[in-house]
């Protein structure tokens, strides 16, 4: 049983866009070291907005975010925000790779936050960093692709490159924003297996947005469900009953059987 102090604590977090849409409404959440927390909910429920507010890619309207005991939700200093992001890596649905650069160069980009402006502009990486990048590619099973251009890879391989790039930050928290929604069923499990391995073997806490409950039940240690920007469920994957499923996704929704994905 996890009894540690929270790695991440969110208090009364809200986000309202300029057009008046309230994407998040008074979110309160704790995430402990070593958890694999999955956030579920319909498209537009606030899942992506939540993750983007956590690492300040989007500015919260109100509320507090504490990361490793430090309040980061209201910080305005660019250098402090950069420091926070260096320990809070993120991967995205569409990979965000540089298509014409090599796989190895894309992975090395994960070290840019630790570089000076001058080093970043010139892409200066040490031999040790190159060795580390190759090791991270080995960890996600594509070391042999290091010299290929990123646009020569399949979708699943691109996401594994994105994971290897995230590991270059040496994060304590990995945010995964719908990491498998654009992948085929078999590849979904390959990517999710690597995320679980990173979580269990490297001790990196993971927060992932997912759609398919079969994946949630297989990989999550805990689940939070959002609906219209509010948390409507929090608990273990096995506690999502058929009644809860309908409350989260609507009366007409149908679950995806484990054999379907």
Curated annotation (Swiss-Prot):
Belongs to the ABC transporter superfamily. Phosphonates importer (TC 3.A.1.9.1) family. Pfam families: ABC_tran (PF00005). It is a peripheral membrane protein. This is Phosphonates import ATP-binding protein PhnC. Part of the ABC transporter complex PhnCDE involved in phosphonates import. Responsible for energy coupling to the transport system. GO terms for cellular component: plasma membrane. The keyword Cell membrane applies. It is found in: Cell inner membrane.
């Amino acid at each position: 049983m996890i009894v540690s102090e929270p790695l991440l604590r969110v208090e009364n977090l809200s986000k309202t866009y300029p057009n008046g849409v309230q994407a998040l409404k008074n979110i309160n959440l704790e995430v402990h070291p070593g958890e694999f927390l999955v956030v579920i909910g319909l498209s537009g429920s606030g899942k992506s907005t939540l993750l983007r507010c956590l690492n300040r890619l989007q500015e919260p309207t109100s509320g507090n975010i504490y990361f490793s005991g430090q309040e980061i939700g209201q910080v305005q200093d660019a250098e402090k925000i950069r420091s926070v992001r260096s320990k809070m890596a993120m991967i995205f649905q569409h990979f965000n790779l540089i298509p014409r650069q090599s796989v190895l160069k894309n992975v090395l980009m994960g070290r840019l936050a630790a570089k000076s402006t001058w080093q970043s502009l010139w892409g200066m990486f040490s031999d040790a960093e190159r060795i580390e990048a190759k090791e991270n590619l080995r960890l996600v099973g594509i070391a042999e692709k290091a010299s290929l251009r990123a646009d020569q890879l399949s979708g699943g391989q691109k996401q594994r490159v994105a994971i290897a790039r995230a590991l270059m930050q040496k994060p304590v928290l990995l945010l995964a924003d719908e990491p498998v929604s654009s992948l085929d069923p078999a590849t979904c499990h390959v990517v999710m297996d690597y995320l679980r391995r990173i979580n269990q073997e490297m001790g990196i806490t993971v927060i992932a947005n997912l759609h398919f409950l079969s994946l949630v039940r297989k990989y999550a240690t805990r689940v939070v469900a959002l609906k219209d920007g509010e948390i409507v469920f929090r608990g273990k994957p096995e506690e999502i009953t058929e009644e809860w499923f309908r409350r989260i996704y609507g009366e007409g929704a149908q679950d995806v059987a484990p054999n379907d994905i």
